[in-house]
C-alpha cells in the first residue's frame, strides 16, 4: 500500500502512528491524524465516514493442552477498559455465568498470546490472529460465542486530496470500492 502510494505521491510525508483504536480515534477527532485504521467490535454502529475493510469473528485463544481453561475463575488476558474485544469477552462470560479474573492487561495482542502460550490465561482475539499464532495456541469453542469484529478505515472530516488518495490505496488493497 505504502509503496504504491509513495510512487504516485513522492513528495508526501507519511507518518505512521500505532496505538489502540480509542487513542487513534481521539487523535483523528482532534485533527492530529488524517486517516486511521481502527478495530471495532460487537456489531457497534460504524460512523458515517467509516469504510469497512474486514470483518471476522472473535474467538477464544487457549493453550492446546493447558489447564487454564478448566480453572474458575477463568483467568483472562485482555486489553484496557474500552477495548471492544475485552468488552465482548466480559459480556459473553457474564451472560454465560462463568466467573472470571482479569489476570493480564496488555493492549498488544502478542502479549496476550504470550500469556495464553504459558497457559496463564485465555484471550478473546480475532480469529485470524489466533489461527496465525504459533503453537500451542488453538481456538476453543467450549466458551461462549463471541461477536464479530470489524477493521475500518476512517478519515478526517474534511480529508485532503492526499488523504483521499491514500484512503483509495487502502480500500483497493482490501478489495473495497471507494
Per-segment meaning from a language model:
Residues 19, 33-39, 107, 123-126, ...:
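Short beta-strand and adjacent tight-turn residues that come in two discontinuous sequence segments
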Residues 154-178:
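Extended ligand-binding regions for polar small-molecule ligands
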Residues 38-81, 148-158:
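Hydrophobic/proline-rich hinge and linker segments of small-molecule sensing/allosteric domains
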Residues 28-29, 89, 114-119:
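Hydrophobic residues within well-ordered alpha-helices
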Residues 74-96, 163:
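Secondary-structure junction motif
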Residues 1-44:
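Central regulatory/effector-binding core of bacterial HTH transcription factors
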Residues 13-19, 99-108:
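Short beta-strand-to-loop elements that line the ligand-binding cleft
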Residues 45-51, 117-158:
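Beta-alpha-beta core module
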Amino acid at each position: 500500500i505504502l509503496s504504491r502510494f509513495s510512487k504516485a505521491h513522492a513528495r508526501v510525508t507519511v507518518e505512521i502512528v500505532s496505538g489502540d483504536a480509542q487513542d487513534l480515534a481521539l487523535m483523528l477527532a482532534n485533527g492530529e491524524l488524517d486517516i486511521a485504521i481502527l478495530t471495532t467490535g460487537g456489531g457497534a454502529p460504524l460512523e458515517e465516514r467509516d469504510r469497512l475493510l474486514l470483518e471476522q469473528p472473535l474467538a477464544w485463544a487457549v493453550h492446546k493442552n493447558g489447564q487454564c481453561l478448566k480453572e474458575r475463575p477463568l483467568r483472562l488476558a485482555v486489553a484496557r477498559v474500552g477495548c471492544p474485544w475485552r468488552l465482548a469477552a466480559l459480556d459473553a462470560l457474564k451472560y454465560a455465568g462463568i466467573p472470571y479474573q482479569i489476570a493480564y492487561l496488555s493492549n498488544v495482542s502478542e502479549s496476550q498470546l504470550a500469556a495464553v502460550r504459558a497457559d496463564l490465561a485465555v484471550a478473546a482475539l480475532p480469529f485470524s490472529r489466533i489461527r496465525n499464532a504459533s503453537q500451542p495456541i488453538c481456538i476453543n469453542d467450549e466458551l461462549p460465542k463471541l461477536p464479530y469484529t470489524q477493521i475500518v478505515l476512517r478519515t478526517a472530516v474534511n480529508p485532503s486530496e492526499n488523504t483521499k488518495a491514500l484512503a483509495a490505496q487502502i480500500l483497493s488493497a482490501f478489495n473495497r470500492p471507494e
